[in-house]
Amino acid sequence: MDACSLTAKQCTPCQGGIPPLTAEEAEKLLVHVPRWELKDAATKLKRTFRFENFMEALDFARKVGELCEAEGHHPDIGIGWGYCRVEFQTHKINGLHENDFIMAAKVDELAAEA
């Protein structure tokens, strides 16, 4: 599997009741989205995107929001002058799921188009 394989996938609804990915499983998927980092004992996936100004960061955050709404899998987004921080976690399982990596790959693809 590579990042292209991840972007071809759709998020599947997570109803909870399943275990989150282990740190080892998350590390294997992280290889496909190398600009992202695991945080909080491998329960979150985070990347900070850099921009020339606040409005570019705000526009990117809006595009990420639209993408995530279409997939039904929503990140925590933080913006400030020259940056947009995107953090995924599957809240129903309090950890990471393949959906988080699918969305990270799709956000990377969106950033490459910007």
From Swiss-Prot:
InterPro entries: PCD_sf, Pterin-4-alpha-carb_dehyd, Pterin_deHydtase. GO terms for biological process: tetrahydrobiopterin biosynthetic process. It comes from the Bacteria. It catalyses: (4aS,6R)-4a-hydroxy-L-erythro-5,6,7,8-tetrahydrobiopterin = (6R)-L-erythro-6,7-dihydrobiopterin + H2O. Disulfide bonds: none annotated. Its EC number is 4.2.1.96. It is an enzyme of class 4 (lyase). GO terms for molecular function: 4-alpha-hydroxytetrahydrobiopterin dehydratase activity. The keyword Magnesium does not apply. PANTHER family: PTERIN-4-ALPHA-CARBINOLAMINE DEHYDRATASE-RELATED. Belongs to the pterin-4-alpha-carbinolamine dehydratase family. This is Putative pterin-4-alpha-carbinolamine dehydratase.
